[in-house]
Curated annotation (Swiss-Prot):
Topology within the bilayer: Multi-pass membrane protein
Gene designation: nuoK
Protein name according to UniProt: NADH-quinone oxidoreductase subunit K
Keywords of this entry: Cell inner membrane, Cell membrane, Membrane, NAD, Quinone, Translocase, Transmembrane, Transmembrane helix, Transport, Ubiquinone
PANTHER family the UniProt entry points to: NADH DEHYDROGENASE SUBUNIT 4L-RELATED, NADH-UBIQUINONE OXIDOREDUCTASE SUBUNIT ND4L
GO annotation, biological process: ATP synthesis coupled electron transport
Similarity comment text for this entry: Belongs to the complex I subunit 4L family.
Quaternary data: NDH-1 is composed of 14 different subunits. Subunits NuoA, H, J, K, L, M, N constitute the membrane sector of the complex.
Keyword Cell membrane in record: yes
GO cellular component: NADH dehydrogenase complex; plasma membrane
Catalytic activity as recorded in UniProt: a quinone + NADH + 5 H(+)(in) = a quinol + NAD(+) + 4 H(+)(out)
Role description: NDH-1 shuttles electrons from NADH, via FMN and iron-sulfur (Fe-S) centers, to quinones in the respiratory chain. The immediate electron acceptor for the enzyme in this species is believed to be ubiquinone. Couples the redox reaction to proton translocation (for every two electrons transferred, four hydrogen ions are translocated across the cytoplasmic membrane), and thus conserves the redox energy in a proton gradient.
NCBIfam families tied to this protein: PRK05715.1-2 (NF004320), PRK05715.1-3 (NF004321), PRK05715.1-5 (NF004323)
Organism placement in taxonomy: Bacteria, Pseudomonadati, Pseudomonadota, Betaproteobacteria, Neisseriales
Annotated signal sequence range: none
Amino acid sequence: MLTLTHFLVLAAILFAISVLGIFLNRKNLIILLMAIELMLLAVNFNFIAFSHYLSDSAGQIFVFFILTVAAAESAIGLAILVVLFRNLQSINVEDLGSLKG
């Protein structure tokens, strides 16, 4: 049977992969957005695990709020990415400095 520890270890691994993805690849905006989404997924996984094992539905409610914010963040991030690609023909983070006025 799976215990709370199994879920917390899995969430910690997901979080570590996302932090590693952010630190190792700082040039590509798409990968940065995916790593941030993976980080939010790990947090949601913790909320669901604690909610299940403590028999409290508050964690599941928080997950819905976090998913809503993550969807809005993804939509705004991808819209900014499309505008950046149209203007600069690149999605590198280093090219953002040329947009300063």
